[in-house]
């Protein structure tokens, strides 16, 4: 089992670099940095991380091919690979409609866009002259002026078609899920995609990009996770909620509370233990270890400790290192 950790560059880059260095010291394998227009730039942040760490792999978790042209993404991640001494990984997904609506960007044909973008980025990274007349991605003899070496590409994927595509074309897949029930479905879709193109499914790094909250006090861990879990519930397809026995009405109540900024209700009772169980890896080190082992048994090969990580971020990173990574 590999271990990653996610940081959101709402914090200054040097603060994230401190946490990344601490994560490296605690045995984490990957640091993933989110990419949203309203936070600090992902590649600027990754540059700071590259200069302040030595061995941990660093990557975007995840960028997309709507706000950034694939040629620009290829140049950016190739630069990170060069600065970091070959430690860069690229996380690329379809993005999210709410962000694109806010930016005035049309979200068209995400499956075709993602597939074509990955092919173009691979060709750019390999030093090829790229000429494509794809359904969504088009180039006419574009080429980077430098070679990057091999950079693994991970796909952010949720739905069955995206998961199947990840099995076909990606080195890894970043799945926003925390529960074995969701990975039973996801692993099968990835396997289907891999076998379609003659790949060994074990070549794909199946990553649980999870809401994670750890503390020796389980109540503190749960309280830290509630707001993040609320947003997950509000954005989950009804089919996923049904899988976990959560009603559409409960989803609506949580969505309404978020829209009103009523976080007191979320902390009070709207976010139930059932939701915490379904949509997070949460609790004491022993609780988290049990869930990780359950996920490993299904086929998960990397755990990413995503927001909030814990009520005290520094303490949580050290707890994961000492009580989970060291023992696995």
UniProtKB/Swiss-Prot annotation:
Q: Which InterPro entries match?
A: F420-G6PD/mer, Luciferase-like_dom, Luciferase-like_sf, MeH4methanopterin_reductase
* Leader peptide range in chain numbering: none
Q: Where does the UniProt entry say this protein principally localizes?
A: cytoplasm
Enzyme Commission number: 1.5.98.2
Q: Where in the cell is it found?
A: Cytoplasm
> Which pathway does it operate in?
One-carbon metabolism; methanogenesis from CO(2); methyl-coenzyme M from 5,10-methylene-5,6,7,8-tetrahydromethanopterin: step 1/2
Presence of the UniProt keyword Ribosomal protein in the record: no
Listed under catalytic activity are: 5-methyl-5,6,7,8-tetrahydromethanopterin + oxidized coenzyme F420-(gamma-L-Glu)(n) + H(+) = 5,10-methylenetetrahydromethanopterin + reduced coenzyme F420-(gamma-L-Glu)(n)
Q: Which GO terms describe its molecular function?
A: coenzyme F420-dependent N5,N10-methenyltetrahydromethanopterin reductase activity; oxidoreductase activity, acting on paired donors, with incorporation or reduction of molecular oxygen
Q: Which UniProt keywords apply?
A: Cytoplasm, Methanogenesis, One-carbon metabolism, Oxidoreductase
Q: Which GO terms describe its biological process?
A: methanogenesis, from carbon dioxide; one-carbon metabolic process
Q: One Gene Ontology cellular component annotation? A: cytoplasm
Q: Which SUPFAM superfamilies match?
A: Bacterial luciferase-like (SSF51679)
Report the family membership.
Belongs to the mer family.
Matching PANTHER family: 5,10-METHYLENETETRAHYDROMETHANOPTERIN REDUCTASE, PTHR43244
What does this chain do? Answer: Catalyzes the reversible reduction of methylene-H(4)MPT to methyl-H(4)MPT.
Query: What name has this protein been given in UniProt?
Result: 5,10-methylenetetrahydromethanopterin reductase
